[in-house]
Amino acid sequence: MFDRVEINIKAGDGGSGKVSFRREKFVPYGGPDGGDGGDGGNVYLEADSGLYSLLNFKHKRVHKASNGEGGMGSRCTGHNGADLVIKVPVGTVATILEENGQKRVLADLAADGDRTLVAHGGQGGLGNTHFVSSTNQAPMLAQKGQPGGEYDLILELKLIADVAIIGYPNVGKSSLLSLLTAAKPKVANYPFTTLSPVMGVIERPEGVFVMAEVPGLIENAHLGKGLGHDFLRHISRTRMVIHLLDGTSENPIDDMIKVNSELYLYDASLSERPQVVAINKIDDELVQLRREELKETFKEAGLEVFFISALTGEGVDVLLAKVAEKLDILKAADISETAPDHEVKIFRPAPKGKMGFRITRLEDGWQVEAPEIERIIEHSDIEDPEVRRQVMVLLKHRSVQQSLIKSGAVIGQKIITGRMEWYL
């Protein structure tokens, strides 16, 4: 199963505003009529029950929404970019990789139709109609569209099943699953026969439930040994666990303790999953001889144990009856929870500070970071004296010059704003 992938998502950039003038007698330049740019498309993740793995992402890492169109004359706004909906299997967890290297879960798509907005499209830039003032009746300024959000995501598929069969490698998990369901896991007499989770459906008079075999766990699985990380995360989405032990093992209860320790060390909540303990290979003569001894040992530990044979089916019905009983209790508790309403969840990036401008001292002058004005500079011909004059008026209007002087700048010093150099 292809169940973990890193992808890059990019929302659409906003379209740039338009500098244009209508033809009208006695109005300078015919009067401004530049339209705004369209907004860039958003990126969504949506759970789809028709998908079963993340294989679609193996050869396509970058996913982009459409950009917004630029503004047009006659005050016409550009078309918004088309949204991008990325379909993922139910049970997918999306984690964002922050710039500081930290990881943050932003979406857990646990039900069919769950949708999360993970990247906002950039806002369209303003056309020159927005820059009209009493002193500037013919603005030659327009704004570049904002860039869309761009993030690196980790998508992890955690299987969703009612029951997980766990245990050491080669204890008979695959044999038990194939006996109970139509699933056909690989069965052989060597460790790690199963390298990915296998699910099957069990139909009983008490009801239908889904059972999954989680590949064998070994010591230090919580550190990733033996593909431990890949296996352990699947247990977190199951209601309960069948802990299968090998009756021919020298110390089955010690095996159980070691596996449970790995669950706890990986995620303490996993060790709290309800468990039914089953000892396999009761068809083996040695296990039959040890049966009462093993039963007493587990009883002293406060555990009820079921003896089964995944080969002959002995004891399996009794085990399943107990599992079904526990599941009924767990499912009844779930009924009180609110059903998913498929409301679109929205991921909002952490704010990067207040809008406005920031002044920084440089070796040979000063830098003014003003995102809104920089977008105008980026989209304007600053070599044109009239355009440059209008930008300077904006800088003055936003109190940038006064703030520079208060910060220690003196007349004649070089100032950098975006790609424009100017002097105080």
Curated annotation (Swiss-Prot):
Metal-binding recorded as keyword: yes
Keyword Nucleotide-binding in record: yes
Stated role: An essential GTPase which binds GTP, GDP and possibly (p)ppGpp with moderate affinity, with high nucleotide exchange rates and a fairly low GTP hydrolysis rate. Plays a role in control of the cell cycle, stress response, ribosome biogenesis and in those bacteria that undergo differentiation, in morphogenesis control.
Entry-linked SUPFAM superfamilies: Obg GTP-binding protein C-terminal domain, Obg GTP-binding protein N-terminal domain, P-loop containing nucleoside triphosphate hydrolases
Disulfides per UniProt: none
Protein's name in the database: GTPase Obg
Cofactor: Mg(2+)
Predominant location category: cytoplasm
GO cellular component: cytoplasm
Domain OCT: 349-424
Binding site for Mg(2+): S174, T194
Species, as recorded: Dehalococcoides mccartyi (strain ATCC BAA-2100 / JCM 16839 / KCTC 5957 / BAV1)
Record keywords: Cytoplasm, GTP-binding, Hydrolase, Magnesium, Metal-binding, Nucleotide-binding
